[in-house]
Amino acid sequence: MLFRSNWHAGAKAPEKILTVHSIGDVPSGWFCPSDPGLYRNMLRALHNAIGKYDLEGWTACTEATHWSGMLYDNDPAMLAACPVPQYDIEIGSSPVSWTDPEAAKAVADALVHVFDDDTRPKVVLACGGVHFESAFSNCGLQDEYPVMCAHILPNQWMVSGQYTGAEGLAKLKAAAAAIPGGIDAISFHDNQAAPYKDVCRQLAAELNIPIFKHRTLRDPAKLRAAMEQK
């Protein structure tokens, strides 16, 4: 298990956030392992630490799966050489937030709680949506029905990576295979074009698992019903 602590920035990035995200290069289809239970524990530990350190206005959230090595022209194939789950934990998204000592304490505090719960949640491969999609974060934070989106493939990178046809199916399979124990369901976004939804449906059919719209993740009761459909 490997965590890297970092800072987050971006033109449209939200402020006062503690984020955690799985590692992978979605366009090329290379992914590090992602343990859904430990990923969920880390997200929830960040959420709890916000309250503990009285970080008013802060939010704990996930981000889309990505790898900062692409910014430096590194080969994404090297991700296959790491056999253990990897995650980035980040404070965002401005110098004011990066230098907040209480935020740094919250991250440090959260790290020691990553192994507190050995529950394996139901596992979703999340396809489509935007980089910060609240439905993906909130389903991991709710207590009613333990679920985690172990890899999150946003729409823009599925498009740039041509996640259609045989090539797209192979990349989706690579994302699913990078999750120890496999996946229990696939979610897709309403705004995805038909060819991208089709390849998600194809993988769900091959794995004999449910597939549903991402909005289902917002309601634990509907999520349970969707996850348990046969």
Where are these regions (language model features)?
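Short acidic, S/G/P-rich loop/turn micro-motifs used as interaction or catalytic elements
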Residues: 9-10, 96, 191-196
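Acidic, Ser/Thr-rich low-complexity intrinsically disordered segments
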Residues: 121-191
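C-terminal accessory extensions appended to soluble enzyme cores
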Residues: 180, 195-230
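Generic non-transmembrane alpha-helical segments
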Residues: 38-53, 106-117, 203
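Active-site-adjacent mobile loop/cap segments within catalytic or ligand-binding domains
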Residues: 61-118
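A short, glycine/acidic-enriched catalytic loop
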Residues: 10-34, 143-162
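Intrinsically disordered, low-complexity linker/loop segments enriched in Gly/Pro
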Residues: 17-75
